[in-house]
Amino acid sequence: MYGMMTGMSLATMRAIWMMVIFLVAQMFGKSYDMPTAMGIALFFMLLCNPVRILDAGMQLSYMAIAGVSLGNYGMKRLHKKTGFRRFQKRYPLRFRVVQSLFYSVTLQGMMLPVVAKTYYEIPVYAGLLNLIVVPGMTVVVAGSWFGLLVSIGTISLGRFAMLPVGWMLQGYTWLCERTLELPWNTLVTGEIRGWQIGMWYGGIACTLVLLRTKTRNKLRDFVYKHTGRFWRKREVVRYTVCTILISMLLQGAGQALCVWQQRTEAIYFLDVGQGDGILIRSPDGRNIVIDGGSTSQSKCGTYTLLPALRSQGMTEIDCWFVTHTDEDHISGLKELLLQGKLTQIKVRTVVFSAYVFQDAALAELEAVIRAAGITIVWMREGDVIGDDTFTLTCLHPTAEYRAKDKNAASLALAYHSNTFDMLFTGDMDADAVADMDIQQDYDCIKLPHHGSKYSYVEGVYAHADYGLISCGYNNRYGHPHTEVLQGLAQEGTQILRTDEMGAVIFRSR
């Protein structure tokens, strides 16, 4: 009933399967073994749908149970020692603290690669938060049931009974929010590979094997030789601090050992729907973004830009170029800036055209940028950003060009390196494209205005191997227009579309 009421997520399904196995074991007078129950639940869930193994929620759920099982195994081995049992009986509160820390380490150890693979980051203080939040959840659940039963008689009395639970949950929320404001609250890992995950779990497996061999006797003798020191408060604090440091080292190891990011030159045309979003990692390691917004995707910054930046380990953006201030080019940027430090993304400089169209949208965005303490740079035709390895050159608008609207005043940028030659055109109209008088060959030209026929100039794209169109699937504007697609085909330019292909990536070998 609970599973049906909550939508029967895969994590809930796993819990129900394991609960059923527990009840069956009790009925037949058998002992319940958590790893066995976990294996049976996994078998039947995958039997129904093998693709479930790729679901992040399912992976996290099973790794959490694996961490608990590993903690149970460790505690059972320790409990066989007389000194440890004596410590448990004499100092139950201290024992619970040490036990909680131990389980926190095993949980983080098992879940860390999956968390990094799914979210491209590792929460540093998660283990410490669990020490505070998890023990109190017993009170929350018990209080919730009590309030539910009381509310059967009268709703008003039920609300009163639920007040302590509400206060606790509000306190947990406040604590989590304050934690997000601490320095180094997350380690952005970038996209990790299968072999890195294999190395992490292989290391855990080797550690367990090591502890089951002759070496474990020497290790245990060393540990239990100092068991008596637990009687003194000073030593309890010392062991507690050591356990916390081990937890923190696990997080650091997750970034240093398991996490590896490609540092090669790459250009990413993101699938932001009806909008533009381009990430560039230059040969010298600079992180550059051009635009970043959408009118078809809600919260484009949170759900598209931020994961993309984190997946590539881009926590610091050296330059964020804004071609013009239409919402489908700036909504994601504004969203990230308004979230502030919560995103863990630092933008050093935002670049506008010196001849950007002046309107209310520009004034609003400029105010947000200045409030975030970010430098604003105004770029003119011929201005260059880069070094010996790459250059980004402003081609448009010129000082003489008179734009009739903000699209025509879009910033046009030419990217040149030893590997790629690309042209980014914002939402330029046909007159602006013709004004640039493009003669150079490019590997790829991003078509202006999402493939609009009103921005297409015949003959321009014959200079490019690829024509990139960033647009939303089945958008209301009909982008890209048929005339544009036919023109590109006649010019021999290969068409790349984010609405059909998703994100398009150019990466040097």
Where are the language model's segments positioned?
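Hydrophobic alpha-helical transmembrane segments in multi-pass integral membrane proteins
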Residues: 110-116, 145, 172-182
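Internal helical hairpin/lid segments
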Residues: 136-145
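Hydrophobic alpha-helical transmembrane segments in multi-pass membrane proteins
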Residues: 1-126, 192-260, 455-458, 464-466, ...
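Non-cytosolic membrane-interface motifs at loop->transmembrane helix junctions
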Residues: 123-134, 159, 188-190
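Non-globular, low-confidence helical/coil segments that flank catalytic cores
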Residues: 82-94, 150-509
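Hydrophobic alpha-helical transmembrane segments of integral membrane proteins
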Residues: 109-110, 131, 303
